[in-house]
Amino acid sequence: MSAISRSEVEHLARLARIDMTDEELDRMAGQLDAVLDAVAQVASVVTDDVPATSHPVPLTNVTRPDVVRPGLTAEEALAGAPASEDGRFRVPQILGEEA
């Protein structure tokens, strides 16, 4: 049985505002199903005797100094938005009642 349906992929694509053809939806459903199967397989491994680690190889973070640079204006930031209102990003309401 599939872990993710085509309609769920369609719903996710709509939430992400990604236009997908029927062929792409079918292909993506299969690919995501394979990913979820792989995750389930990894989750099923018994690791009671394996000590917890954050990373198997010791690494040191390499950072750079913070440098102040000019950012985008509100207009520039909103220029790529699919919808805006009163100088803000307009997004679908997902919580609460209609205002």
Swiss-Prot record:
The chemistry this enzyme catalyses reads:
L-glutamyl-tRNA(Gln) + L-glutamine + ATP + H2O = L-glutaminyl-tRNA(Gln) + L-glutamate + ADP + phosphate + H(+); L-aspartyl-tRNA(Asn) + L-glutamine + ATP + H2O = L-asparaginyl-tRNA(Asn) + L-glutamate + ADP + phosphate + 2 H(+)
> What name appears for this protein in its UniProt entry?
Aspartyl/glutamyl-tRNA(Asn/Gln) amidotransferase subunit C
- Pfam families xrefs: GatC
The record's similarity note reads: Belongs to the GatC family.
Sorted UniProt keywords: ATP-binding, Ligase, Nucleotide-binding, Protein biosynthesis
Q: List this protein's GO terms for biological process.
A: glutaminyl-tRNAGln biosynthesis via transamidation; regulation of translational fidelity; translation
Q: Which residues form the signal peptide?
A: none
The function of this protein is: Allows the formation of correctly charged Asn-tRNA(Asn) or Gln-tRNA(Gln) through the transamidation of misacylated Asp-tRNA(Asn) or Glu-tRNA(Gln) in organisms which lack either or both of asparaginyl-tRNA or glutaminyl-tRNA synthetases. The reaction takes place in the presence of glutamine and ATP through an activated phospho-Asp-tRNA(Asn) or phospho-Glu-tRNA(Gln).
EC number(s) per UniProt? Answer: 6.3.5.-
The record's annotation in InterPro entries points to:
Asp/Glu-ADT_sf_sub_c (IPR036113), GatC (IPR003837)
Origin species, per record, is Kineococcus radiotolerans (strain ATCC BAA-149 / DSM 14245 / SRS30216)
Classify the source by domain of life: Bacteria
Q: Which PANTHER family match?
A: GLUTAMYL-TRNA(GLN) AMIDOTRANSFERASE SUBUNIT C, MITOCHONDRIAL
Please give the subunit comment from the record: Heterotrimer of A, B and C subunits.
Gene Ontology molecular-function annotations: asparaginyl-tRNA synthase (glutamine-hydrolyzing) activity; ATP binding; glutaminyl-tRNA synthase (glutamine-hydrolyzing) activity
